Amino acid sequence: MTKSELIERLASQQSHIPAKAVEDAVKEMLEHMASTLAQGERIEIRGFGSFSLHYRAPRTGRNPKTGDKVELEGKYVPHFKPGKELRDRANIYG
């Protein structure tokens, strides 16, 4: 599901709210989540999961085109850990 599909689905389920208001709310929520993570804070949504930053240590990688070794710097990457309820609901396909 893309962001625009999410907005369309929410707008159709909440017909009393203008589609533009739904779009603005979704965009604002995602922007707030991104800025919270950028500040190094953790986001927890009970029953859904948590978002945090994990440190990826420096390492030697390879250029896929040339095969040359490339030194990659350490960096923080976003990480999502699903909550138990989400894991249980997703397990109906497994």
Curated annotation (Swiss-Prot):
MF GO annotations: DNA binding; structural constituent of chromatin
Secretion signal, residue range per the UniProt entry: none
Q: Which PROSITE patterns match?
A: HISTONE_LIKE
Instruction: Name its GO BP terms in alphabetical order.
Output: DNA recombination; regulation of DNA-templated transcription; regulation of translation
Q: Which UniProt keywords apply?
A: DNA recombination, DNA-binding, Transcription, Transcription regulation, Translation regulation
One GO CC term of this entry?
cytosol
Q: Which SUPFAM superfamilies match?
A: IHF-like DNA-binding proteins (SSF47729)
Q: Is Ribonucleoprotein tagged as a keyword?
A: no
Check the record and name the CDD domains matching this protein: IHF_B
Q: What does this protein do?
A: This protein is one of the two subunits of integration host factor, a specific DNA-binding protein that functions in genetic recombination as well as in transcriptional and translational control.
Q: How does it assemble?
A: Heterodimer of an alpha and a beta chain.
Q: PANTHER family under this entry? A: DNA-BINDING PROTEIN HU, INTEGRATION HOST FACTOR SUBUNIT BETA
- Which family is this protein grouped under? Belongs to the bacterial histone-like protein family.
NCBIfam families per UniProt: hip, PRK00199.1
Q: Output this protein's name.
A: Integration host factor subunit beta
Q: Identify the coding gene.
A: ihfB
